[in-house]
Amino acid sequence: MPSPRTPRPLDHLVLPVEDLDTARSRHSALGFIVAADARHPFGTENACVFFADGTYLEPLAIASREECEEAARTGNVFVARDQAYRFRRSDNGFSAFVVGSNDAEADHARFVELGMSGGEMLAFSRPMTFPDGSQQTASFKLAFASDLRSPDFFGFSVERINVPAAERSALTAHPNGVEGISEIILSEPNPTDFQYLIGELCNNRETEANSFGMSVELNGATVTVFNKAGLETHLGIVDPSRERGLLGRAVVYRVSDLQALAALLLKNNVTARQVAGRLIVDPAPGQGAFYCFEEIR
């Protein structure tokens, strides 16, 4: 029977980086346009990469360690999780995926009821700078979901309040031809152990499982969790570790012309390999996940 739920849209991905200059340089070499630096009111900063499909990447850095530590001490889940990720993994990675929401408070109540709340909601405002140089104050509400068995990956929903529609065509016309995100890839030795967490975040309880892992559909994108066999077959990654818990691994992008992208990467001295019809660029400073590019059919 089809699910009565409506899958959420993918909003963005959180990608911890050591500093924004390195992230900007790396993503520019990959053929992305990177937006202006922006600061959060709790000590972190980002330089986002926006896409025509409404999704975006959030390379996230520490602007003020003192402000971040104070925010974490006073219950800011977003900062506390970022601090923990950097301590446990590194300053270069993929720590969370985010879905869009019209009611973050209802999401929080549902996460609490289901025993998967990641902590108290976060509400904040900050100025936004648009390509024409204008600024407006935007407000956000975040509801967090997590699993104690998975300390290095979490998710949340975001509700935007009084955020005006922005003309971002200048920021989405990427030289590499990327038009959006088609899939995000996580890993875990036994993926279905986390099907309820992923399903609730996606607002979709229909799970497609096979010998390589499982997938849950968002509105416009797919969340896939691979086991070790799936990582090796689909990404060419051999992982000898025995650790458990979800890990953010890869982002799959829709690109208009794979051959043109390959030429751009070669020109910019970016190494890529081909696996199952996709171009894959391995992580590097400023790029904490595998980036996979597939041509739009």
Identify the role of each PLM range:
Residues M1-L10, L15-A35, F51-F124, T129-R297:
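Glyoxalase I/VOC metalloenzyme domain signal
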Residues R39-H40, A47-F51:
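Short glycine-biased active-site loop of nucleotidyltransferases that positions the nucleotide triphosphate
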Residues P41-E45, V275-G277:
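Short acidic/glycine-enriched loop/turn segments that link adjacent beta-strands
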